């Protein structure tokens, strides 16, 4: 649980913040948010090339000057903000491998830069080479269908006599909401192909940045909870599709019913969201797919 609490929710926040500022044409603030996101997890850096391209108006005069400004905003600024998150390590004397360069051969490159580069290379080697088998590993292909949610905690007991009890914290989204959002993503892609409006473009950009890069690391051990950064854009996709459905004349009562069903589904799964002890049979009834166990 600590990994999600300490990292992923803040990564998601800064990605959303960067997206909001980009949409509002506040590029400096968007770049700062990207740097902060990258400081939480390197996957935040995926925003840099995408947002850089989005921010450039290629049909506008003064392209060279515009490029210089955008490069400063979306490349240099995120790097500086990212480096600022390392200040605690930089100004320490006993951080991990802080004095690594002292034991190496002499170089014209300052020891501080060599130490920092070494630390980053070690991080990169660890994460790209992380292929240990794990019972809850989940390939990105399965994330959109809730193929293998991560169990953070499970405990069984005999307190519910004559039957046993189960207590679990399962990192899973509200199934009805998640599956509806996945379907809406496919619909959004279709609508974008038909009419490339700003909203659908922004939603799909968010999905591309937060989801597709994971497919380049097929041999790496990955988990479903990495999808937490995708979830805001999936929800936006669902809201977008609902909005388009209302514009096309669908009755609001159907939407209200759908929202109500999602709420009921959320309440039903709440015990496994927060680790409430329930009868084993009740827990088993909530394991809709065998891969959830």
Model-derived features: where do they sit?
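Transmembrane helices and adjacent periplasmic/lumenal helix-loop junctions
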Residues: 2, 28, 32-56, 79, ...
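Short acidic/glycine- and proline-prone juxtamembrane loop motifs at membrane-interface regions
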Residues: 3-10
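Specific aromatic-rich, kink-prone transmembrane helix
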Residues: 10-34, 50, 234-237
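Membrane-interface helix-loop-helix junctions at transmembrane boundaries of multi-pass membrane enzymes
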Residues: 59-72, 185-205
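Aromatic-rich transmembrane-lumenal/periplasmic boundary elements in polytopic membrane proteins
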Residues: 79-142, 146, 279-287
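Hydrophobic, aromatic-rich transmembrane alpha-helices
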Residues: 156-159, 164-197
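Transmembrane-helix signature of polytopic, lipid-linked glycan biosynthesis machinery
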Residues: 207-222
């Amino acid at each position: 649980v600590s990994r999600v609490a300490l990292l992923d929710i803040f990564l998601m926040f800064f990605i959303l913040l960067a997206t909001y500022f980009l949409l509002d044409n506040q590029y400096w603030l968007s770049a700062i948010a990207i740097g902060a996101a990258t400081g939480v997890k390197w996957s935040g850096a995926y925003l840099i090339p995408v947002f850089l391209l989005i921010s450039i108006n290629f049909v506008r005069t003064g392209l060279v000057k515009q490029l210089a400004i955008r490069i400063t905003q979306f490349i240099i600024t995120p790097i500086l903000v990212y480096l600022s998150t390392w200040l605690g390590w930089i100004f320490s004397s006993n951080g991990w491998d802080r004095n690594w360069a002292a034991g190496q051969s002499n170089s014209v490159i300052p020891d501080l830069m060599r130490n920092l580069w070494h630390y980053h290379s070690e991080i990169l080697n660890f994460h790209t080479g992380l292929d240990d088998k794990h019972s809850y590993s989940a390939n990105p292909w399965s994330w959109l269908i809730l193929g293998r949610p991560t169990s953070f905690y499970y405990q069984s007991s005999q307190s519910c006599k004559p039957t046993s009890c189960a207590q679990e914290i399962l990192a899973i989204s509200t199934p009805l909401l998640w599956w509806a959002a996945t379907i809406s993503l496919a619909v959004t892609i279709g609508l974008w192909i038909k009419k490339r409006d700003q909203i659908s473009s922004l939603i799909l950009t968010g999905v591309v940045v937060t989801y597709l890069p994971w497919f380049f690391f097929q041999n790496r051990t990955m988990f479903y909870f990495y999808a937490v950064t995708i979830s805001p854009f999936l929800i936006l996709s669902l809201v977008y599709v609902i909005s388009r459905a209302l514009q096309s004349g669908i009755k609001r009562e159907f939407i209200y019913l759908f929202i109500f069903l999602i709420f009921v589904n959320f309440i039903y799964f709440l015990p496994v969201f927060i680790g409430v002890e329930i009868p084993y049979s009740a827990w088993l009834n909530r394991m809709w797919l065998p891969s959830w166990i």
